[in-house]
Amino acid sequence: MATSRLEINFVRLLSRCESLASEKRAETEWRLEKYVGALEEMFVALKKSPSKPTPETLTDYNRKVDFLKGLLEAEKLPSPAEKSLANQFLAPGRTPTISSERTPASKTVHIQSKARCAGEMRKELMSSGVSNSALLENDLRHRKSLPVDERQSAAELDQILQHHHNLQEKLADDMLNLARNLKNNTLAAQNIIKQDNQTLTQSMRQADVNFEKLKTESERLEQHAKKSVNWFLWLMLIVVSFTFISMILFIRLFPRLR
């Protein structure tokens, strides 16, 4: 089947979107989002077209459109950690969009996006580490310059903070134990359900065996009943025949008196 004009335009726009997604864009860049919106509309029209491509091709097109939409949504997330997590769930296309591609462009975009998120997370961790060190050093200097009463208040505050920290650790341990207990209960429930299923399967098998035995016994009784009826009919036939012959002989042996 020849490629329709709508599919050709869709592939061109898809290739353009993948090219824009692979570039480093400013936060005010709006073209990719508009292009992806138009791409989604064209894909809906392509699915309804009489000369639509094969189901496998449509599935790959849909996968690439969903990947671009998910990529845009991931870039709007506030923190690098959230962006990285969202990127992990993205599924790029499996085939090249145009014939000149050796590797699918969406896979390349996915790798670049994950690398950018990792770099942003690294920068954030380094900056937070430097700022925390500076804050700690300033706090120590400030405490050394405080009077005795204020130092004592700071020590009490540290104790309160340590107490809250211990409570948080205890709460985390309790939640971990609760999760473990929940997991153990789930596994136990699964084992019970599995055993019940096995028992039910065995009961069904036993019921099938009993049904077959009952069927065999019913057939045997039916055959026995048929034999009994046949014997009774033969017996009646013999009795009737004997009676008839006896009457004939009696008439012949003792003729009627005149």
UniProtKB/Swiss-Prot annotation:
Gene Ontology annotations of biological process type? protein transport; retrograde vesicle-mediated transport, Golgi to endoplasmic reticulum
Q: Where does it mainly reside?
A: endoplasmic reticulum
Which InterPro entries does this entry report, sorted A to Z? Vesicle_transport_protein_Use1
Q: Does the keyword Hydrolase apply?
A: no
Which residue ranges are assigned to the Extracellular compartment in the record's topology? 252-258
The record's GO molecular-function terms, alphabetically, read:
SNAP receptor activity
Compartments (UniProt record): Endoplasmic reticulum membrane
Task: Outline which residue ranges sit on the Cytoplasmic face.
Answer: 1-230
Q: What this chain does, per the record?
A: SNARE that may be involved in targeting and fusion of Golgi-derived retrograde transport vesicles with the ER.
**Name of protein:** Vesicle transport protein USE1
| Protein source organism | Danio rerio (Zebrafish)
